[in-house]
Amino acid sequence: MNSLIFLAVICSTAYVAFAQNTPIRPPFLPGPPAAGAPRIPAKGVAGLARQPQKSLLNNPYLMMMGDKYFEVAALDMLMDPSSQVSPIQQMVIAKSADLSPVDMMVANRLRGAQGTGMRSMYFPAILAMM
């Protein structure tokens, strides 16, 4: 009986050691993509090159979550003087983020109040009040 237990322990130890030696990459970790169709780089029109989409994981507002997250992220985008948003896009963003007309007025006012191309010093305080 003892030899049987010993054999079982040896076998299970060997199996675990073997299993640990095979690296498994979970699909959500960064790394080379799975083999499939090769990615063809999109050809952009000269002068209209888009900025690469920022990852959601780098977004500080993700910590806020909830419904407020969408409002704050939309306001942030609308207030940022460096982002070029057409009036139609502004309307779509405001509608999808459920912003009130007052929020839009404040966003437009803040956007015009910053000539230097960076958000105003009071930006976090203003967002906290909304």
Swiss-Prot record:
A single GO cellular-component term on record: extracellular region
Broad class of the protein's primary localization: secreted
Subcellular location: Secreted
Top-level taxonomy: Eukaryota, Metazoa, Spiralia, Lophotrochozoa, Mollusca
Signal sequence segment: 1-19
Keywords of the record: Secreted, Signal
Taxonomy, superkingdom: Eukaryota
Organism this protein belongs to: Haliotis asinina (Donkey's ear abalone)
Protein name as annotated: Uncharacterized protein 4
Tissues in which the protein is found: Component of the acid-soluble and acid-insoluble organic matrix of calcified shell layers (at protein level). Expressed throughout the posterior zone of the outer fold of the mantle.
